[in-house]
Amino acid sequence: MNRYRTAEAFWQALEGRLRDLDPAKPLAQKRQLLAFERFLERVRQVRPGTILKGGLGLRLRDARARATRDVDILLTGDAEPDGAILITAGRLDLDEYFSFTVQFRRALIGTKGNQFHSKCTIGGKLFAEFDIDAAAPAPMVGEVSAIPGCDWLSFIGISRPTFDVYPLAAQIAEKLHALTVPRQTPNTRDKDLPDLAILARLSDGTPTAIIRAALEATFLHRATHAVPARVGGVPAEWAKPYGRLAGELGLEWRTFEDLQLAVRRFLDPVLSGEATGSWSVAEWRWR
């Protein structure tokens, strides 16, 4: 039970705790992550089986992954999520003073779903705000993982939540699809390449067949272009922002060239059909 009698007293205690936890990270970033998790816990209670994907799912798997500004979920049971579940979830009282409003923003492009905007408040005071991409389930290869969230509210007796996170193989396939989809304008998705390298680092022991099946299912479902034979070239303009990102996150691929090579060694053998066996992170090759 929340021992703080007012929302203001809780806010002050929470801010102090967040500042003490991992002082190197910006307070706003920690606020955002906590708001994400408290909202997702509400959605999970209203709609069990909701699957978390996207950047937040990757961040829960690996704390070194980049921060994200939105929540990306699959709402099981909804042919095309209309927001009713999210609005109901936002109103749940979980005895921690958080409250969420949810408003429709736009329909998602390329998938059945909608984007919503949420404001998280504590005692009527804005704590964080973010977008929610809520989509209906699509063909999915691989196993959903149960990943624990943050233990930041234990001081008021709230246990660490656990979330169902999108399969690694399916996320790899979607990242590659987004990276290679034909475009009429310059590709600005410069975060997809480092995300793929991090996903490779998390995929130790994954069989080639699982990655290949996920690629085939994703590209068939999206129906925009064929599975490529190789990763191919990426815009040279991505090198500068990657240099900053690598420094911020302490990524082991120090240069943009190192990053490209790492991703190609992971995916090109699968795309060409040469890879067999399973992925070895230690050797960074298929064996």
Model regions and ranges:
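Compositionally biased terminal segments of proteins
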Residues: 1-287
